[in-house]
Amino acid sequence: MIEAAVDRGIREMQEEPKRSVRKLADLGRQFSRGRFQKNFFDLSQTLLQDDNSPYYTILSRLTRETNHETLKKFGVNIGYTSWTYGASLIRSYEKEHGYDVPWTVFMHYLPDGPLGLKQIGGLIEEGRSIGIYTYFIYLEEMPEDWTELTELFHSFDNSAFLLFLPDRELEDGDADLLSGCRNLLVSAEIASCYRENIRLLKQRGCIVANHYYYYSSDPEEITRQVKDCDSPLLLFIARDDCMPEDRRRVADAVYDIRYHPEFPVFPVELHSDFRRVDQIISGRTCLLEVEANRKVSLPDGSFLSALDPDMTLAGLLRKISGQTVCGEYA
């Protein structure tokens, strides 16, 4: 039923984007039940009041450039399975067990590194059982063979994955494998190879994004990156050496650009906006990021000891409970 409604919505967006999107936003606000949906549709109504809003261009590009099955699958997986069904499981689990659960997990994958796909798959399997259906995976290096990684995405068909590519060229065959994963968004780092990588992925109907690693809060640089972006979604990610005050300034700047758009790009400051979603779902925030060496990264730059290969996700969440990683959103 949900997928049929999404199919109809995609068709209508192709034919009459402005009218269909407004209709969806109005209906969504009227019938939304969950915390996240109410916030999302309130925002959508506000942003789409302007007939010349660049967000109409974004939606038109998405329906024109993206495989519709991929758009539907990824959209349902993150919009319903993660932010509605999964969010309900997370709230119930937090109430029962007394510690915070994030709505997503960040994992760094290095082929042949300590954090292997078997352990990643185990964390995902357990995460889904407590409501975590979205996963961010940073590739530290391009794998020689993409088969195992894409099989991981296929094996969790109703989860949503966001894959961050390093600055290395994709091969045609690699892009073919990635395009077969309907539950996947692929982001190319803004560096020397990203335009060619985005071209290959767009040719195959993938949902694409760009990500940019920043170390300062230069407003002109932020605007330039948004203006020059080749994708409808641009993710700003702070470098490890970026100062906290610069991160806050970038988060504020991105938030302002999003509410007063000039270009057909939706900008996101990854960690601050991740926390906004978590705050809506749980009323608190919790960040879980596992490095390729199996250490757990904390927001203050410190690390927990290396993740034991046999440690469960529940055990890890209990271990970080009370650390600076979790708490009220500010």
PLM feature spans:
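Accessory C-terminal segments flanking Radical SAM cores
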Residues: 1-45, 254, 258-330
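Core AdoMet radical
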Residues: 104-117, 127-144, 156-197, 201-218, ...
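Short, flexible, glycine/charge-rich loop motifs used to bind or transfer phosphoryl groups or to couple energy/partner
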Residues: 95-96, 152, 174
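Conserved nucleotide-cofactor-binding alpha/beta core module
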Residues: 147-148
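Alpha-helix N-cap and loop-to-helix initiation/capping positions
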Residues: 115, 119-122, 249
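Conserved C-terminal portion of the radical SAM core fold
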Residues: 109, 134-138, 193-283, 289-296
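N-terminal [4Fe-4S]-dependent radical SAM core
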Residues: 34-107, 129
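Generic structural signal for hydrophobic
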Residues: 123-127, 153, 177-178, 201, ...
